Design a protein with these regions (language model features):
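Conserved ABC ATPase signature
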Residues: 156-160, 164
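A short, proline-enriched helix->beta-strand linker immediately N-terminal to the Walker B motif
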Residues: 175-179
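Conserved ABC ATPase "signature" region
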Residues: 78, 124, 133-151
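P-loop NTP-binding/switch modules centered on Walker-like glycine-rich loops
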Residues: 186, 190, 194-272
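The feature captures the beta-strand-to-loop junction immediately N-terminal to the Walker
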Residues: 47-49
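Short catalytic/signature loops enriched in Gly
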Residues: 2-4, 17-22, 27, 244-284
Length: 284
């Protein structure tokens, strides 16, 4: 049995680009020749500036973006799923095992549905439960794990704060009992005072439910707080990957050093200047 839950091998994702309707279509590589292994039970961080390809990579691993070259293998306890050759029937099974936590808790929840119906929807769509009683029991169980009260299940999303809405989003992602979670900027839209609460909840759920995370973020201080291993993306490439403490203590790539230099310090005596990257942007 593999110790990895996800293996990404020589993965590239391209999109068609056309300046105007008269110009010729071109291919732009959003993700270029990525190789990573995500170990079971790990909190794997993926960082980089906007446009570096983080979200595209995460969506490709979930099967939401079409893979141009390479492959993604999801190692389940019973079998492996190859996302380049996966059938529609297998994809339905895979979606029970790999889920996404969205960035914006305000846009991710339907204002016309109660919290109970929002959390229960994956169970009904995937036909995981066989009766309303079983569905309600599953919803109540995961809601309590995500620190939601039973009275919350009867309310609509507008009645909740940003942190509470994100807990609802987390409960919806976990109700199908997945083993792998892609958290795409899952605390970026929240106040700093709420971020720590959500991050601690994710860590707690990781231990309780034996979860593996791919945590996508541009906030290095957040990644340092929760991640075991960190990969740095730049222009669709992984430029550096190392255990979290090692990467923050001894960065090797110039881009990683530039990212770390941009983190503000709370020490008024410490003076640090952001490193400016020089030269031309590499051609992909």
């Amino acid at each position: 049995m593999s110790e990895n839950i996800v293996s990404v091998n020589n993965l590239s994702v391209s999109f068609d680009y056309q300046e105007n309707f008269l110009s010729k279509k071109q291919k732009i590589k959003a993700v270029n020749n990525i190789n990573i292994k995500i170990k079971k039970g790990s909190f794997f961080g993926l960082v980089g500036e906007s446009g570096s390809g983080k979200t595209t990579l995460g969506r490709a691993i979930l099967g939401a973006n079409k893979i141009s070259t390479g492959n993604v293998i999801f190692h389940d306890e019973e079998r492996d799923f190859d996302l380049t050759t996966i059938t529609p029937k297998e994809k339905k099974e895979y979606r029970k095992k790999a889920q996404l936590i969205f960035q914006d808790p305000y846009a991710a929840l339907s204002p016309r549905m109660t919290v109970r119906d929002i959390i229960a929807e994956p169970l009904e769509v995937m036909k995981i439960t066989k009766s309303r009683e079983e569905t309600d029991a599953r919803v109540r169980d995961i809601a309590s794990k995500c620190r939601l009260n039973l009275e919350h299940l009867r309310r609509f999303p507008h009645a909740f704060s940003g942190g509470q809405r994100q807990r609802i989003s987390i409960a919806r992602a976990l109700v199908s009992n997945p083993k792998f979670i892609v958290a795409d900027e899952s605390v970026a839209a929240l106040d700093v005072s709420i971020q720590a609460d959500i991050l601690n909840l994710l860590k707690q759920l990781q231990h309780e439910l034996n979860l593996t995370y791919l945590f996508i973020s541009h906030d290095l201080s957040v990644v340092a707080h929760v991640c075991d291993i960190v990969a740095v993306m730049y222009l669709g490439h992984i430029v550096e990957m190392a255990p979290s403490r090692e990467l923050f203590r001894n960065p090797r790539h110039p881009y990683t050093k530039a990212l770390l230099s941009s983190i503000p310090s709370i020490d008024p005596e410490k003076k640090s200047e952001a490193i400016e990257l020089k030269g031309e942007i590499p051609v992909q």
